[in-house]
């Protein structure tokens, strides 16, 4: 491999000749060989959009000439298009401010912009990473701004569409399952009846509420730290920079961003991203419950509850022939566990904003994006490989319904709670039906029993 010599304020550094990064990126690459977690590509692209917006605004403010602005914008567009993905090698486990990733971006843009302007970045710097690309900025305000951009963008473009897809499927299932009466269960024990549509309407409502909660968390996430520079005072930044960059990003990305009204808050706290992830954790909890219920209701096929039939996607056992497992449900529940773990990490990291700067930024955004990707991908997978194919096992549903002792609840208004309990206990002890038990105890006539104990009349309130 051929190398060139780059330099920074600490001296000279050898850098692979085919790479566009510079000295500070190389130092980080060599100093932090920790784990395999790299800066997510979507974060890199959000950062490039930010640098593009800054170049445009600095040009409008008269601080950056047209030639450099045009070259920087083109370099950013190429990064966003994925042409330089292999030039962003840094680990998440680096400085907690994200400074080295900010400089990685600055160096790649500067060297590519120099090339665009006709220069050879290996010999000269027509565009400087600090003086031009990082003009009026600090890592302390650019990295959290990139975090906000990518978080909002991915929630809107990836998470919500995947959630909407699952919501649409459950809306269809509620309609399909209307009129199918089944036994309810509380405490893992038989309870009073409801319809399968009512049960699934609960799942649907949970998903709708999760969507509302996630969307409701976004307004403060749209507040950008840019313009705060090092500690929130805006030192070396034009007073109009923050507002103009927010407007530029809104136009560029197509979703609303605003300048944070308090830059000291924006640099030292990540409560907004913590709040949004909390809503995502709420979605994970709902998905855990829904997937668990569905796999229990589909358990069997002969010795379980067996009230639902789910798609058979692959063999389930390496030793038991013919076994099929609820694998999509299991994947969703594992994702939910991971998201809950990420929430703990994000919450603790967000609490560590010592003085003017939180220095846990990379791990916060990495875990946030991992949770978002896992939730979106698992919902899509669960939907197409399981949810759309869920069918009721009507024979098993009817069998379980009519063998449940909890239908005795319908007798409460007519013979009282204690007598109804005697009917249920007598039936259970002797292995007879509720009707037989009632007749044996002489509490109501057969005609009245048939009138009172009617599952179709037990699925809603009655005056």
From Swiss-Prot:
Active site as annotated: 187 (proton donor/acceptor), 317
Residues that hold substrate according to the record: 97-99, 128-131, 138-140, 186, 318, 323-325
Subcellular location as annotated: Cytoplasm
One MF annotation (Gene Ontology) recorded for this entry: fumarate hydratase activity
Enzyme class: lyase
Catalysed transformations (reactions): (S)-malate = fumarate + H2O
Any one cellular-component term (Gene Ontology): cytoplasm
CDD domains: Fumarase_classII
EC number, as in UniProt: 4.2.1.2
Keyword Lyase recorded: yes
Marked site (Important for catalytic activity) residue numbers: 330
Membrane-spanning residues: none
Gene Ontology terms: biological process: fumarate metabolic process; malate metabolic process; tricarboxylic acid cycle
Source species, domain of life: Bacteria
Chief location bin: cytoplasm
Assigned keywords, A-Z: Cytoplasm, Lyase, Tricarboxylic acid cycle
One Pfam family it belongs to: FumaraseC_C
Pathway: Carbohydrate metabolism; tricarboxylic acid cycle; (S)-malate from fumarate: step 1/1
Subunit structure: Homotetramer.
Membership in a protein family: Belongs to the class-II fumarase/aspartase family. Fumarase subfamily.
Record's miscellaneous remark: There are 2 substrate-binding sites: the catalytic A site, and the non-catalytic B site that may play a role in the transfer of substrate or product between the active site and the solvent. Alternatively, the B site may bind allosteric effectors.
Stated name of the protein: Fumarate hydratase class II
Gene source species: Campylobacter jejuni subsp. jejuni serotype O:2 (strain ATCC 700819 / NCTC 11168)
Lineage: Bacteria, Pseudomonadati, Campylobacterota, Epsilonproteobacteria, Campylobacterales
